[in-house]
Amino acid sequence: MENKRIDTIESALEDIGQGKLVIVIDDEERENEGDFIAAADKVTTEMINFITKEARGLLCVAVTMDRAKELQLEPMVQRNTSQHETNFTVSVDAIAEGVTTGISVYDRAMTIKMLGDETSHADSFSRPGHIFPLRAMDGGVLRRVGHTEAAVDLARLAGCSPVGLLCEILHEDGSMARLADLMTIKEKFGLKLITIKDLVAFQMRRSKLVQRAVESNIPTAYGEFRLMAYESFTDQQNHMAFVKGDVSTDEPVLVRVHSQCATGDTFASLRCDCGNQLASALRMIEKEGRGVLVYLMQEGRGIGLINKLKAYNLQDDGFDTVEANEELGFKADLRDYGIGAQILQDLGVRKMRLMTNNPKKVVGLEGYGLEIVERVPLEIEPNAVNKTYLETKRDKMGHMISCSCGSGNH
């Protein structure tokens, strides 16, 4: 598709600020879905009527985590097993003059506008209802590359309340509208069409999730590195980057994005391969003479140390690593790579050879505009303790592991 058919973020923000709809897709290079997005506080009955006729999808409203707490919008389910981790809350209807069943165009428009009205409170809504709020991650598209976060970011950047209306666009036959369909809608109704990829780049230029606080030379058993410590504005953690050589050139850089594992990295636990992967990555960077290891404080694939140990207890009772997380009410992997991407951006990394076995990590980092020219395997020979763990990562989480772990029937 020609890029000239994709509108600028600035032009879309102008339209949103004027109370218009825009179409948002993931990336112009992909045959993916598109959503109508607008600022919730600019919604009209005419807009909702148009969306129900032309989009045919589910009317949702993206809110910040703080706004969800203010309005007491609790998660729809305690155990979210949705494929894309969409953070639905309980559905709502507005309690207001003229609102009856909640399903009419007027009723839904009122509910959406009131969700975007800062004077609304928890008692302004009945539950369940006909509008589905979604909780956006703090940090927006720089933390999660999704339409939910895009809706909040776009509303905020347009000078509106940071609450966004979004609705998937379906084809007339009920299937998902694809790129050609979305372009037809764009031209027919004179709407702006933008990509989340461009929004991420726009936010990368103007918003920072992390700030480099200090750096120092660190001699290690694997070699000498420059250690950069970063302060995070979203999770209040201190993250690190071990840097070898000049990584700010156009030549692809050997990179490892490693999440904290205190038990494996520090105490050499045999339950996982984390410590061995960390050591191997540092050795490979030292041998290369140039590279980066980003160390993110995302213990236990993002569930924290205490929950990780609870998961270990469940594994001792027969659960695998995925089942244990789900039994505790978590997804198999809660990590996000927005912070890691910003650290790499700060270091000047443009192209990378990424050391990972995890396809989600490749997709996650590419979503932030980083170019991965090669995936470098980082396989560790299993031991008697972690054999089943590695099989589960391969068979259930899609990790690209070719080691002799057995049949995987566990």
Swiss-Prot record:
Pathway: Cofactor biosynthesis; riboflavin biosynthesis; 2-hydroxy-3-oxobutyl phosphate from D-ribulose 5-phosphate: step 1/1; Cofactor biosynthesis; riboflavin biosynthesis; 5-amino-6-(D-ribitylamino)uracil from GTP: step 1/4. Mg(2+) 1 binds at E31. The active site is at D333 (proton acceptor), R335 (nucleophile). Its cofactor is Mg(2+); Mn(2+); Zn(2+). Keywords: GTP-binding, Hydrolase, Lyase, Magnesium, Manganese, Metal-binding, Multifunctional enzyme, Nucleotide-binding, Riboflavin biosynthesis, Zinc. InterPro entries: DHBP_synth_RibB-like_a/b_dom, DHBP_synthase_RibB, GTP_cyclohydro_II, RibA, RibA-like_sf, Riboflavin_synth_RibBA. Residues 206-410 are annotated as: GTP cyclohydrolase II. Mg(2+) 2 binds at E31, H147. NCBIfam families: PRK00393.1, PRK09311.1, ribA, ribB. PANTHER family: 3,4-DIHYDROXY-2-BUTANONE 4-PHOSPHATE SYNTHASE (PTHR21327:SF18), GTP CYCLOHYDROLASE II-RELATED (PTHR21327). In the N-terminal section; belongs to the DHBP synthase family. In the C-terminal section; belongs to the GTP cyclohydrolase II family. This is Riboflavin biosynthesis protein RibBA. It comes from Chlorobium phaeovibrioides (strain DSM 265 / 1930). The lineage of its organism: Bacteria, Pseudomonadati, Chlorobiota, Chlorobiia, Chlorobiales.
